[in-house]
From Swiss-Prot:
InterPro entries: ATP_synth_B-like_membr_sf (IPR028987), ATP_synth_b/b'su_bac/chlpt (IPR002146), ATP_synthase_B_chain (IPR050059). This is ATP synthase subunit b. GO terms for cellular component: plasma membrane; proton-transporting ATP synthase complex. Keywords: ATP synthesis, Cell membrane, CF(0), Hydrogen ion transport, Ion transport, Membrane, Transmembrane, Transmembrane helix, Transport. The keyword Membrane applies. It is a single-pass membrane protein. The gene is atpF. GO terms for molecular function: proton-transporting ATP synthase activity, rotational mechanism; proton-transporting ATPase activity, rotational mechanism. F-type ATPases have 2 components, F(1) - the catalytic core - and F(0) - the membrane proton channel. F(1) has five subunits: alpha(3), beta(3), gamma(1), delta(1), epsilon(1). F(0) has three main subunits: a(1), b(2) and c(10-14). The alpha and beta chains form an alternating ring which encloses part of the gamma chain. F(1) is attached to F(0) by a central stalk formed by the gamma and epsilon chains, while a peripheral stalk is formed by the delta and b chains.
């Protein structure tokens, strides 16, 4: 029952206070709480917000700088890529030119070697022909010189008479 009497006492006291106060007119507690709020707001605005804003501004500046560096790096990369592509294109053209020149030089070298080989063959054949002609002429002279004597020996063998002495005396 103690609980019920405490509740009744609290309700009656609240009713008495409610009759004397007007909710449209603020009382002293409101002004005290408002003053504390304004002091806390001033302290936070003076000591907490400026360092946070400074850090945020520095962060924004770093982000902007990083973005600018990124754009500059992308532009440099694109320029380097273009230079690389141009250099590669030029190198391909130059290598193609050098390869074609090497092929032409190789064909010229092969043709020159073929001409030299043909000249060597012709000169070798000419030298061999001249040598064979000289040997043939020498053999022919030798055979002509010996042909008379051989025919006499052959005739004397066939006839059985020595013809060598009579031909030589004539």
């Amino acid at each position: 029952m103690f609980e019920v009497s405490a509740i009744v006492f609290a309700v009656s006291q609240a009713a008495e206070e409610g009759k004397s106060s007007n909710f449209l007119l603020p009382n002293g507690t409101f002004f005290f709480v408002l003053a504390i709020f304004l002091v806390v707001l001033g302290v936070i605005g003076t000591f907490v917000v400026p360092p946070i804003l400074k850090v945020l501004q520095e962060r924004d500046a770093m982000v902007a700088k990083t973005d600018a560096d990124s754009k500059m790096s992308a532009a440099q990369f694109a320029a380097a890529q273009a230079d690389y592509e141009a250099a590669m294109k030029e190198a391909r053209v130059q290598s193609s030119f050098l390869r074609d020149n090497a092929r032409v030089d190789g064909r010229k070298s092969i043709e020159e070697a073929r001409v030299r080989a043909e000249q060597h063959v012709v000169s070798t054949l000419q030298i061999a022909g001249e040598q064979i002609k000289r040997e043939r002429d020498a053999v022919e002279l030798d055979l002509r010189a010996k042909a008379g004597a051989m025919s006499l020996i052959l005739a004397s063998r066939i006839l059985g008479v020595d013809i060598t002495a009579s031909v030589v005396t004539r």
